[in-house]
Amino acid sequence: MIGRMLGNRYEILEKIGEGGMAKVYKAKCHLLNRIVAIKILRPEFAADENFVKKFKRESQAAASLSHPNIVGIYDVGQEGDIYYIVMEYVKGRTLKELIRENGGPLEVKRAVEIASQVCRALDHAHKNKIIHRDIKPQNILVTDEDVVKVTDFGIARAANGATITYTGDVIGTAYYFSPEQAKGSIVDERTDIYSLGIVLFEMLTGKVPFEGDSPISVALKHIQEDILPPSRLNEKVPEELDKIVLKATQKDPNLRYQTASEFLKDLDTFLKNPKDLKFEEKDFEKTKVMPSREAEELKRAALKREREKKRKEIRKKVGIVLLVLLLLASLSYGTVYVLNNFFKVNDVVVPNVVGLSLSQASKVLSEHNLKMEISEERYSDKPENTILEQDPPQGALVKPGTTVYVVISKGRQMVIVPNVIGRDYLEAKNVLENAGLKVNIIENYNEQYQKGYVFDQNPRYGVQVEYGTTIDVYVSKGPKPSIVPNVVNMNLDEAKASLESAGLTLGKVIYKEADNVPENTVLEQSVPPDTEVQKGSPIDLIVSKLPQNSLQQQTKNVIINLPNKDGPMKVEVYVIQDGQKNLVYSGEHTSSDSPLTVPVTAHKGKAVIEVDIDGQVYSRVEARF
């Protein structure tokens, strides 16, 4: 796998880890020139069509999550029989490694801070209707800067959904199971709260609350046994923190924190002032031991394969007996008739339930002595819980009690629009498409964002929209350029004003003798009219002056002592004569150019010479020409 290129984009560099369902590699994205992590499904899962469908759907949903405490999912892809997720590459280690390296409990404050960051991640995910189902230290990364990032949202959800629907087994780590997970029941967001409570217990004590010889024995303890307060194992744990852990790990989900934000609020309060925490007695009712019937169900699940094996042996023996009976029955037509009527069971015609609601379909099938089981939930434009498909189909002949498997609608898939403002447009497009959204790129000028970066989006981020909605993404073309105006034949003052109104500056002014043209008239400009240039660009001008042999004009050299300033300064020289003020020189200089000599031409007689520096009057002197 090392050196392989996936999707003509991701080059596999090295293996950095592996788990029960996938292997993780460090890779380079050649499109965006960045390092990423790629999780590749193990072949045994990639070969399971139902698992792959669930995996794709849930990974794409998880890709819509955008939060600093969640490992970002950039891409979900397939190449042949390889299914992979492209994720944010996190420099750091897992929380499990951190606990092992510490050789015992973490410092109390640090443990609570880590749990708080995980809570923030769960709160964001739960608000987006995504449950993790496999919160454990191995799925919590801690960066070198102590930023916590939760990973494996997509793969955990896909595994859980697939196994509940298709096998009845429970995938996950038994040490962190909630009681409802251990029983294989339907779970909600509170299962993550329980698991995080177990993780917090481990951070505070250096060990998990329950251990056993097998996953089943550990799962039974989660169902039946009380969790000790962490302070029993670590005297540094305050009583208030004991109560937080015990509330999060109540057997009854209704007695736990009901949301991650509730859990987070108590953790933050503990960090600020533990005495402000308020708990009610009902929060800590004695753990109710689950009925032995439910415990037995869990035990029986472990013996399921053994029973299946025995059933096969019984079926084999029954088959032999039936074969003997049929051979005997063939002795006469009358015997066959008797046996047929004795063993005959009337077949049932499967009714149509497609288009019905779940409750309606259940009633119809029950009336026909048939059972119903949900095989898949799928997003569609049909109302929630509407039957989309059935198997066996309408009209099929089946035995009474046969199970009809149905696919039901989850309604229209809704997604939260992620924030892509400030991202490179290729990255923004990838994030939105991974969230199941379409992208419409609109390019426009923008003064604040550099070319190629997103400066706006519509709908805005955080809005809930239907899966497949098109998002308008506004990409910057950079600052809007200025159009160079035509200033030829204008006098110099008019030309300067025209350039400034267009967002441009007057550059160098070069004087050229010209006959039959008024003095200070623009003869040429350095950039042609209607040309697009960057805002603030200087435009040089060639301006007319009277010929040297003119008896009406005289030229004198004006010596200017420039001020001592850092950087360049703009020097402009004006001649004020006969009630008119004319610009006769403009240029940029530094203090090192001092003294500056400027030739000034004026009509015979008195004139005032004004020197402006950076737009401010610097000096005025009267001269005679």
Curated annotation (Swiss-Prot):
Specify the domain of life of the species encoding this protein.
Bacteria
Q: Indicate what this protein is called per its UniProt record.
A: Probable serine/threonine-protein kinase Sps1
Which species? Caldanaerobacter subterraneus subsp. tengcongensis (strain DSM 15242 / JCM 11007 / NBRC 100824 / MB4)
One example of the protein's molecular function in GO is: ATP binding
One Pfam assignment: PASTA
Report the gene name.
sps1
Q: Does the keyword rRNA processing apply?
A: no
Q: Give the organism's phylogenetic lineage.
A: Bacteria, Bacillati, Bacillota, Clostridia, Thermoanaerobacterales
SUPFAM superfamilies found in the cross-reference section: Penicillin-binding protein 2x (pbp-2x), c-terminal domain, Protein kinase-like (PK-like)
Tell me the protein family, please.
Belongs to the protein kinase superfamily. Ser/Thr protein kinase family.
Q: Which UniProt keywords apply?
A: ATP-binding, Kinase, Nucleotide-binding, Repeat, Serine/threonine-protein kinase, Transferase
The EC number(s) this enzyme carries: 2.7.11.1
Q: Start and end of every Protein kinase domain?
A: 10-271
Binding residues for ATP: 16-24, 39
InterPro entries per the record? Kinase-like_dom_sf, PASTA_dom, Prot_kinase_dom, Protein_kinase_ATP_BS, Ser/Thr_kinase_AS
